[in-house]
A protein has these predicted regions:
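A short, proline-enriched helix->beta-strand linker immediately N-terminal to the Walker B motif
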Residues: 166-170, 176
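The feature captures the beta-strand-to-loop junction immediately N-terminal to the Walker
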Residues: 50-52
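Helix-to-loop junction immediately C-terminal to a conserved catalytic motif
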Residues: 65
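ABC ATPase signature
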Residues: 108, 151, 164-165
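Conserved ABC ATPase signature
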Residues: 147-151, 155
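Conserved ABC transporter NBD signature motif
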Residues: 73-81, 93, 126-130, 232
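ABC-type ATPase nucleotide-binding domains, specifically the catalytic core motifs of the NBD
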Residues: 29, 47, 85, 110-128, ...
Length: 250
């Protein structure tokens, strides 16, 4: 892993990290997809993971959220190693995965979809969290009784993120949130992600939209063939044309 020097300090120390991943290995069957991944996220950070299709981004998300079991390595969240915990236990700790493709329940209403994100919470907490989501996404309030399957792609993405917020996350993993959206909607969505972060939620943004991600993120990692090959401040990575050309196809 090559680290691009930062002008304003280095990577978070493990003791300061909200998420600290060390030598993570994961895969499917006999295929090892992640081949020794190290990653840190400090409280309040937006960290981007960039890379082309097929390099292991989705596997990383699934391993961090417990959907794919780690074969080796540590995933420490607030100091607790969650590498072998079940997804429900990881959610209860406040690590929430918003998957690629939105995955809303099309025949349920917007409100019912949101409430599924807070199934572990009491009624009072559910109401409070729903109001918080509606303040961030006013369109969801307007469509609260509408079936999720009738929403536009952008509205479904807002619903998927809102459902994640219902679980009171400390860290949200967002897997390709801009996929399939128009440039105008992408700008709107990234502004809303920035607002969520300003409210105290750390963000792991896994994206192919390199330009928008580097503008939003504090730091970035570049994933290639199951390993991080570069990390540093988003500003420094964005200013390196050779790096972007070699690993990001820009």
């Amino acid at each position: 892993l090559v680290t691009v020097p930062r002008q304003n300090g280095g990577l978070p120390m493990p003791s300061e990290a909200l998420l600290d991943v060390r030598d993570l290995r994961a895969g499917y069957g006999e295929t090892e997809v992640l081949r020794g991944v190290d990653l840190t996220i400090a409280p309040g950070e937006i960290v981007a993971v960039l890379g082309s299709n097929g390099v292991g981004k989705s596997t990383l998300n699934r391993a961090l959220s417990g959907i794919v079991r780690a074969r080796a390595g540590a995933i420490k969240f607030e100091g607790h190693d969650v590498a072998h915990e079940k997804p429900q236990a990881i959610v209860a700790r406040g690590l929430i995965h918003v998957p690629e493709g939105r995955r809303v329940f099309p025949n349920l209403s917007v409100r019912e979809n949101l409430d599924l994100g807070s199934y572990r919470r009491g009624a009072a907490s559910r109401t409070q969290n729903r109001e918080r989501v509606f303040k961030i996404f006013p369109r969801l309030r307007e469509r609260s009784t509408q079936r999720a399957g009738t929403l536009s792609g952008g509205e479904q993405q807002m619903l998927a993120i809102g459902r994640g917020l219902m679980a009171e996350p400390k860290l949200m993993i967002m897997d390709e949130p801009s996929l399939g959206l128009s440039p105008i909607l992408v700008e709107e969505l990234f502004a809303l992600i920035e607002r969520i972060n300003a409210d105290g939620v750390s963000i792991l943004l896994v994206e192919q939209n390199v330009v928008q991600s580097l503008e939003l993120a504090d730091r970035a990692y570049i994933l290639a063939e199951g390993k991080f090959v570069m990390s540093g401040s988003a500003k420094d990575i964005g200013a390196n044309p050779e790096l972007k050309r070699a690993y990001l196809g820009m």
